[in-house]
Amino acid sequence: WIASLLLLISSFLILKEGGKLYIDETDPESPLRMYLATRNIVPLSFFSVFKTYWVEEEKSQRLASLPSPAELASQCGADKPIVVLVLGESARGDHFSVNGYGRKTNPQLEQVSHIINLGIARSFAVQTRNSLVGMLTNATEENRVPTMGSFIPLFNKHGFMTCFYSRQNKLGRSGHLTDALIGSSKDIRYFSSPTDQDLLKETEPLFKTYQHGLLLLLHTTGSHYDYRGNYTETFKVFAPDEYTPESMMEHRQNVINAYDNTIVKTDDFLAKLYAQLKDHDAIVVYVSDHGQLLGEHGRFLHAIGGTGTEYPEQKNIPFFFWYSDLFAEKHGDIVAALKHASTSGKIFTHDYLYHTVIALGGIRSKAVEPQLDITGLGTLD
């Protein structure tokens, strides 16, 4: 545990300056920032570091000890599809042109068929480490403490290959809370590759090996700050995109340009992922963990104000599905239900994700709450 603690401390980007320890506020999801940082860099002690570590460790242990949905009665159909859950990062739903944004940030997705868009949804929290709890357990906005662990063991129970591929730092923003949520996956990989697109080099052979009965979680870096460093020149559609942390308000339009370029990058990533799956029995869910402030209220980034009600842009997220022809052929009832939901006018939240993902795998379970299953097909009577 000592080695883990030392890695955790270094991942929080603590800087030595003038004989004192400081926290780098440029990482908005650092638990130390969440507990200790103000708008300016402030001194902090090793005691605070240890305290935060143990708080996180206790949370991790509580998550790991939650009852598993695999322990409850469940059934699974013979046709087991590929289910891919793309955990987007810091993406705002109202900056996607498929949601009516004035800039063409989704030139490829606008041309893709078989997308079912739930519109602009609302996140469980305003930082990754908390939102993942709302996305991967049965926690809801109303009942924020989960009573059931991740759905991954349930897919394991029914013979699915389960994988978690991430470009997020293992001990960084999400901390080891992530490990507690995805630790039952059969294949867990963390990548330090330059872009999200590099994940596609890993998914292509995976889809050739497992042509059905696969649950894959892809945790991308998406639109996380620093925006300009989060995409290549290929996706520099909106310019100028130069700014510094100190000049973000002065160069707000440049910041927005850079942010929108990250959405263009995500557009390309998803289109290529869909292309890899077009001949498979597959469905892809894309949803972001939280949104982002882009100068509204004089603020930037996220993880500001606790619940996010004061700055709602932080909870503004995209939420949509893509399905293949073969999936529609074999699971037409799921497709019909999702299409119906997309025209309901309802504002969807992370509350629905847990129960709906189970149903997408053709699994019916006592763990599924019918009012939170968008398909209406995952409940076991």
Predicted regions and their residues:
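Flexible internal linker/loop segments at domain or repeat junctions
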Residues: 233-253, 301, 327-337
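Extracellular glycan-modifying ectodomains
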Residues: 9, 223, 292
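Metal-dependent active-site segment of extracytoplasmic phospho-/sulfohydrolases and closely related
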Residues: 84, 262-303, 354-358
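A short beta-strand-to-alpha-helix junction
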Residues: 143-147, 253-264, 307-315, 328-357, ...
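Active-site-proximal alpha/beta segments of enzymes that process anionic O-linked groups
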Residues: 12-246, 316, 349-380
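Histidine-centered active-site microenvironments of extracellular/periplasmic hydrolases
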Residues: 100-104, 282, 287-331, 368-370
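Membrane-interfacial entry segments at the cytosolic side of transmembrane helices
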Residues: 1-7
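A long, amphipathic alpha-helix that forms part
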Residues: 67-74, 201, 241-284, 321, ...
